[in-house]
Amino acid sequence: MTSATIPGLDTAPTNHQKLLSWLEEVAELTHPAQVVFADGSDEEWQQLTERLVAAGTFKKLNDEKHPNSYLALSDPSDVARVESRTFICSEREIDAGPTNNWMDPAEMRSTMTELYRGCMRGRTMWVVPFCMGPPGAEDPKLGVEITDSEYVVASMKVMTRMGTSALEKIGDDGFFVKALHSVGAPLQPGQQDMPWPCNETKYITHFPETREIWSYGSGYGGNALLGKKCYSLRIASAMAHDEGWLAEHMLILKLISPENKAYYFAAAFPSACGKTNLAMLQPTIPGWRAETLGDDIAWMRFGKDGRLYAVNPEFGFFGVAPGTNWKSNPNAMRTIAAGNTVFTNVALTDDNDVWWEGLEGEPAHLIDWKGNDWYAGKTETPAAHSNSRYCTPMSQCPILAPEWDDPRGVPISVILFGARRKTTVPLVTQARNWQHGVFMGATMGSEQTAAAEGKVGTVRRDPMAMLPFMGYHVGDYFQHWIDLGKHSDESNLPKVFFVNWFRRGEGGKFLWPGFGENSRVLKWIVDRIEHKAGGQDTLIGIVPTATDLDLDGLDISSDDVAKALAVDPAEWRNELPLIEEWFEFVGDKLPSGMQDEFEALKQRLAKED
């Protein structure tokens, strides 16, 4: 099969020679039945969803409950990011570092080329041009994903600015990231397709120097929507290192005081630590308002005024469904309720609506995420998968900040790090300076969640919530953070804080109510920036006392507040060998600044003896 005999290649709506030659090369390798350029139109979405319903991949939901929305149930083997099959194939192994899987790029290209050979037989090869972030940006980051999955094309319309407008932005000679994806399930003539095609063999591979992504075998979001973690974190972090900016696993939140002054927060939390809930916060303190600019990824660059400005490169929310409800995140529920949403691996109700654990009103009967009957009180397994998702347009969020599409971004006042820890880490701590803040982020540990493979509940170090997403050596990444702090005067840099909403008391009870009440912690942070609030200088940084927090109207015991804020030297002594082990794992590239901060912590602890 040659490119000349593949329908659609000869009518490509572009004169970009490098793009055209790449498309021909991939088509000749993968043997698709046809090539289609995604234009991103609503008509195309309609055709895609109809095709997906006919294939059994999508089920149309009740339009009265969720208009223009669909449910997809994946293969049970294809439900999450596969970190064990995710590779950073830098030219030199040392540049991938100890946190990434590495293979020689030539060897990986050879292996995957053989997997791709004929892999799109019987399928459509979709060409999906996309733009990460507002297209009016000074330096827009563009990409083209080739995929044989209509599920991916439909989801990319929600998650990115894709289609004809992005192709026009690339122009005749613009740079773009090459993102190649296949589910790895070729169809022979007359062969019946699966509702969720995938392959037991999976590779999610990144070539940082050439800015390429090759993905094979998985149809699941993080492995297949290549604009998401693959581009906007792994490849973009390598770009950011080379170009002097930051690509981070962070929400962007706008908090507005009663005086109508806006403060912008960028916050890094590992999966299932309340990132989306905080991004769509409903403050409980009178007079305070919050708006969202993003729930997952922030790209941050220094402006001419020396401040750090953030944009969200995404166009939609790809949120974890279980636990999302009208109490924990009413704004996410309103966003979803507006429709145009793709749900994956949640349960189906008898009236064609969706349900998941944590939603109010458990139905007596459901079809679970595996397609089986599920009965309340009888079926022992969860109805929705723990990593089930909603994919929904950002533009529908009722508290979307007007600046969400501003190519200049917003000036960040606060960088928040957070994690899920039952003990040790207080509710909120302020870093002493930028380098100390980097140390806080570099040493964060969080309990394992369902969003990635691995044992749930064990604590793993997850620096800046970027452990699975750094596109280069973790030691160089820490040094990059330290170096960026020297780009500007300390007074212009965001102030760094660390939060832990998840500390527990006796009997495993959460000490802090969380959700909207977290606005009380953010108010203290704002007051610290404005030099209006007190705090205690502790072993680990500045921590408020109970009287420093605005607790008016909150039903919480003073004992619980004190325990939530406590800094226990014995617990921190237990943490020292864990930090030491982590730094030894980072190896020779650990910056001296991080070792200095660790020694300072040890010395402060020694004085407590």
UniProtKB/Swiss-Prot annotation:
Ligand binding (Mn(2+)): K229, H249, D296
Gene Ontology biological process: cellular response to glucose stimulus; gluconeogenesis; glycerol biosynthetic process from pyruvate; oxaloacetate metabolic process; propionate catabolic process; response to lipid; response to starvation
Location of the active site: C273
SUPFAM superfamilies referenced in this protein's UniProt entry, alphabetically: PEP carboxykinase N-terminal domain (SSF68923), PEP carboxykinase-like (SSF53795)
Keyword Lyase: yes
Alphabetized UniProt keyword annotations: Cytoplasm, Decarboxylase, Gluconeogenesis, GTP-binding, Lyase, Manganese, Metal-binding, Nucleotide-binding
EC top class, as a word: lyase
Residues binding substrate: R81, Y220, G221, G222, S271, N387, S388, R389
Catalytic activity: oxaloacetate + GTP = phosphoenolpyruvate + GDP + CO2
Binding-site residues, GTP: A272, C273, G274, K275, T276, N277, R389, R420, F515, G516, E517, N518
UniProt KW Metal-binding keyword: yes
Pfam families, alphabetized: PEPCK_GTP, PEPCK_N
GO MF terms, alphabetically ordered: GTP binding; manganese ion binding; phosphoenolpyruvate carboxykinase (GTP) activity
Cofactor remark: Binds 1 Mn(2+) ion per subunit.
Name listed for the protein in its UniProt record: Phosphoenolpyruvate carboxykinase [GTP]
